[in-house]
Regions:
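Amphipathic alpha-helical segments
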Residues: 1, 21, 25-34, 162-200
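Basic chromatin DNA-binding modules
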Residues: 3-4, 33, 133, 150-151
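Accessory (non-catalytic) regions of SAM-dependent nucleic-acid methyltransferases
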Residues: 1-19
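Specificity-determining recognition surfaces
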Residues: 137-166
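A short beta-sheet element
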Residues: 43, 55-56, 61-63, 70-138, ...
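Non-catalytic DNA-recognition/assembly elements of restriction-modification systems
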Residues: 16-43, 59
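Short coil/turn segments at secondary-structure boundaries
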Residues: 46-54
Length: 201
């Protein structure tokens, strides 16, 4: 999201994007994901125990996220008993569901409380506009893949996600950027819906 700009007066490299809203100035601050969010993994209840499944808790897998900014309903659900008897965690609304396996770096925002399987390192924002963080983490997909490891399949750990470095502006600028990118996403979704309707008609 950010690239280095040059102050022609002092020939100093600044940590700011080349394109920026004119009302903002000053450098962006470098922080780690750990500074901005709590990183939480997931888990899978025992699939042989019927009482763990078909409950009220949405339970996402990596194949269900990344296609849209927001996700609401999952293909499978788990019960509170299943949640408590697994490493799955109950995540609050507006959690960034970040895939840490398979297609590493895919993400969506949850609209409600939910849980995930172990193929995630989810981000619960603590010091950052969650929409801004959603767009920001997508610019770090190459870093996420590069820091992944594994003999059977690539996976990035919670600790490696926490170490990812990002550049962050003020809260007001975060909100402005997030609003613009969200508007663009909405326009794209509207156009895609129009195309789908035309194809199906």
């Amino acid at each position: 999201m950010t690239t280095m700009a040059i102050d022609n007066k002092d020939k100093k490299v600044l940590n700011v994007p080349h394109l920026r809203f004119p009302e903002f100035s000053g450098e962006w601050v470098t922080k780690s994901i750990n500074d901005l969010a709590v990183v939480i993994g997931g888990g899978t209840p025992d699939t042989t125990v019927k009482s763990y499944w078909d409950g009220e808790i949405q339970w996402f897998t990596p194949s269900e996220i990344g296609k849209n900014k927001y996700v609401d309903s999952s293909l499978r659900t788990i019960t509170e008993v299943g949640l408590n008897n697994s490493s799955a965690k109950l995540l609050p609304p507006n959690t960034i569901l970040l895939s840490s396996r398979a297609t590493i770096g895919e993400c969506s925002l949850s609209l409600r409380e939910c849980a995930t399987n172990q193929g995630f390192q989810c981000l619960v924002s603590k010091k950052c506009n969650v929409d801004f963080l959603y767009y920001l983490i997508q610019t770090k997909k190459k870093d996420l893949i590069r820091k992944s490891c594994g003999s059977t399949f690539l996976e990035i750990s919670a600790n490696e996600v926490r170490k990812i470095q990002v550049s962050v502006p003020s809260d007001v600028e975060q909100q402005k950027i997030a609003e613009l990118l969200s508007l663009i996403d909405e326009r794209i979704a509207t156009q895609n819906k129009i195309i789908e309707d035309l194809i199906s008609s």
